[in-house]
């Protein structure tokens, strides 16, 4: 509880089951996470449980990038995920999409905020955001990824926050979050040297939009990569030989940077 410094949000702490009840059949739900980091890990299991117990529950899922199996895999295998926007790398989700059991749109990771802000993905009913902590003013300390969290928090009708105690509090201060306006009102990003900061280390959040807060203690899962095949090793060898020949011919610097 010491990670939640806002009194109003402290009163909204509840169980995963109660928090998941805010998500209904047919909703569009945005989830935090990027590069298999900073995604909700507890609430998806509650949604899967409801479906496995016979409830009719199907949702559209939006993420800013690749997330872990506790989200994509769990929702895909349980049948909760009916449509998915954003990059993904889950084997089960991919198989179900290729079998036409999940409608999948492979939107580029840079296009998510634009599509959401301009209404191309429809209304976002709920956004589920993993955070390291909540400050006294309600602003959020994000984990090791930001992705499209700022867009989801701003445009979703309702928010559910997963406060993950497994995230080290030292993450506070590492981010520089700048939310741009909708086109054609997008402003310039005034970064001219490496130490320029143009945004905030924290993500502003309206406490009135938060429907529920749940406490978790879950590590991010690393994606298992397959062992290299002979073809993969041959490709890598060809690339190395090509670069070495380019250096020898004087077309690339020696040593390579």
Where are these regions (language model features)?
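Conserved alpha/beta enzyme-core scaffold
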Residues: 1-257
């Amino acid at each position: 509880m010491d990670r939640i410094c806002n009194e109003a949000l402290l009163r909204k702490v509840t169980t995963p089951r109660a928090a998941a009840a805010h998500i209904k059949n047919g909703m569009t739900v945005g989830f935090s996470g990027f590069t298999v980091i900073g995604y909700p890990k507890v609430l998806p299991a509650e949604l899967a449980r409801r479906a496995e117990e016979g409830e009719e529950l199907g949702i559209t899922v939006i993420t800013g990038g690749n997330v872990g199996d506790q989200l994509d895999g769990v929702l895909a295998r349980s049948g909760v995920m009916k449509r998915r926007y954003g990059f993904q790398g889950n084997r089960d989700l991919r198989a179900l999409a290729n079998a036409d059991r999940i409608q999948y749109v492979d939107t580029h990771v840079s296009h998510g905020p634009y599509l959401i802000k301009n209404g191309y993905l429809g209304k976002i009913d709920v956004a589920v955001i993993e955070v390291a902590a909540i400050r006294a003013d309600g602003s959020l300390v994000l984990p090791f990824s930001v992705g499209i969290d700022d867009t989801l928090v701003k445009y979703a009708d309702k928010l559910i926050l997963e406060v993950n105690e497994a995230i080290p509090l030292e993450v506070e201060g590492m981010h520089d979050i700048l939310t741009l306006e909708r086109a054609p009102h997008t402003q310039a990003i005034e970064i001219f040297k490496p130490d320029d900061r143009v945004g905030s280390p924290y993500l502003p959040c309206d406490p009135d939009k938060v429907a529920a807060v749940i406490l978790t203690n879950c590590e991010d899962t690393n994606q298992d990569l397959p062992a290299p095949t002979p073809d993969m090793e041959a490709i890598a060898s060809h690339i190395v030989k090509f670069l070495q020949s380019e250096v020898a011919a004087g077309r690339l610097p020696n040593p390579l940077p």
